[in-house]
Amino acid sequence: MKLVIAEKPSVAQSLAAVIGASARKDGYLEGNGWRVSWCVGHLAGLADADSYDPKYAKWRYDDLPILPEHWQMVMGKDKKKQFDILKKLMNAPDVTEVVNACDAGREGELIFRSVYELAGCQKPMKRLWISSMEDSAIREGFANLRPGVDYDGLRDAALCRAKADWLVGINATRLFSVLYHRTLNIGRVMSPTLALIVQREAEIDTFKPVPFYTVALELPGLTVSGERMVDKAAAEQLKEACQGAAVTIKKVECKEKSEKPPALYDLTTLQRDANRLLGFTAQQTLDYLQSLYEKKLCTYPRTDSRYLTGDMADSLPVLVNLVANAMPFRKGIAITCDPQTVINDKKVTDHHAVIPTRNLKDADLSALPAGEKAVLELVALRLLYAVAQPHIYSETVVIAACAGREFTAKGKTVKHPGWKALEDAYRAKMKDAEPKKEGAEKALPELTEGQTLSVVAAIVKEGKSSPPLHFTEDTLLSAMETAGKEDMPEDAERKGLGTPATRAGILEKLVSAGFLERKKSRKTVQLLPSHDAVSLITVLPEQLQSPLLTAEWEYRLGEIERGQLAPEEFLDGISTMLKDLVGTYQVIKGTEYLFTLPREVVGKCPRCGGEVAELQKGFFCQNDSCKFAIWKNNKWWAAKKKQPTKAVVSALLNDGRVRVTGLYSEKTGKTYDATVVLEDDGQYANFKLEFDQRKGGSR
């Protein structure tokens, strides 16, 4: 009997259906000499700090850095049932071999190995490595199972990544939280990513627009423009000199140009396009793509390659044809297929580019959720683009002279639309299609060198230099992908912040931690840093916010994966960095109150006349010698199922009383309205009720 372990139940069911394990059991499927079970995400993970020593339950500066000598792996608290099933299956006497069928990548490898090792399994291990959930791909994968030891490097890299995140997250978060008296979540990749955004906002805030002026001359059949000028008076003077004058055509240059189709999608490029064109977050796109993968409609999502392998060349025309037939908006557009434009074995590592599968032919696409359908459409369209003919056009550049200055005009004539015919058809069907740039394909009249033309009109156009744009998920993903790239070896496999598989999760963590805010602006959603984000980057040392260092770590993880670097060497480097950080970092003078939000004054203190401000747990006099306070969890208010709000406290402080509705009566169980009066005895803030006598004080 052979045991197959998938990453989730839906994948296990697909695998079981192909290999004939159709009998349902408790937590697994069985049949045809196979048992197929599943994890539920990460069943096991690295233990928390207090598992190594109970004293670590409390965050103390003196305990840092926390550097485990012997790492502990523990089972997830809510995952015991499925873990016990897997442990029993792995160690069953009749099981002779265990097949790792978790996702073919770092995380999938770690999910399986953690369970395998925690269960104490010693059975021979094989690896199912597939890039598609199509039945044919599954059958081929099981026919070519690989030895599990071939992926020890992948396991080592995944475990080192997890340990590095643990070390930096635990130690840096505790260090800065203790020093600045506020929980500050710091991550190996999160913090440099946040630094990119904060730096961009600083550039925007300090940007000063510079005006410029351009003189444009309207000629018969075309308009020519001069270079930008910073002196308005000089621009006006040039305009006057050109008004009514003759223009001499100095040069007419016509070139035929070709624009190659874009490469196929890797995950990051798809996430960027889905954000720009559809407004999806990176995480939404990944979720939709994962679902499509499990429905056998597209290939493995978490890839960093944009090419296919040579063994796919022969079958590609058939796939392209059926994909084209599934895209209704491409009717009337000739479809071509040049496989060589997308084949490059050297640029495919673990998985090839994301493409649709042949199951698209028989799928009911109208039954798909809207988000999945839109993402699948992008993936299908990109395949058609990538194998299509180049976009060929003729570009004409005219240089004219007037009043001793040169003016230029450009024109474009499409010779063969190529892949852009598909792009135009797709954009035409979109509700919020991006408008084409004015004059982008405007042809120029026939002109000859030496020809003279009269100036019909001369105008001065005024403009201003533009500030950098706020990050969107599209542009931030691009910045993360290229961070530190210029300083990395040319052949480096892993560059930038994070990996295609982790970037979406990093952005979501920054949002949930309150460091990033998504703000709608016209057709885009901007990513803006919070007050705490700016404060955090202000106090973080360079090594924790440097994209270069984190990009170098990603490169080192790639070396571990290839067996070129010992895991201990990588982790020792991080431990040394953390020791230096804890030993040398001091609170930056003047930043002690950076993480304290501005306090809003709600009224005057009835005892000392000082200012009363709202804090997290109540309203307090800001005079250090005065102890006046109205707590938000005050028992008198809690008994009436109310909490003193800012408006209520403000009225009590200013008028001594406030009308409150919906007070709860413990005696009757009903609610009533009354006036609450503040009575301060110098030690405690007390409250009493007054009722409108004309209504009989009815409760």
What are these regions (language model features)?
Residues 1-162, 166, 467:
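Intrinsically disordered, low-complexity regulatory segments
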Residues 1-3, 101-104, 181-183, 254-263, ...:
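Conserved short loop/turn motifs at secondary-structure junctions
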Residues 2-3, 25, 79, 90, ...:
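Basic, low-complexity terminal or inter-domain segments flanking catalytic cores
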Residues 9-16, 33-36, 40, 76-87, ...:
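Amphipathic alpha-helical transducer elements in NTP-driven molecular machines
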Residues 93, 135-219, 254-258:
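C-terminal or mid-to-C-terminal helical accessory/interaction module adjacent to the motor/catalytic core
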Residues 233-265, 271:
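Metal- or metallocofactor-binding catalytic centers and their adjacent structured scaffolds
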Residues 295-301:
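Secretory-pathway/luminal and periplasmic proteins that interact with or process carbohydrate-rich
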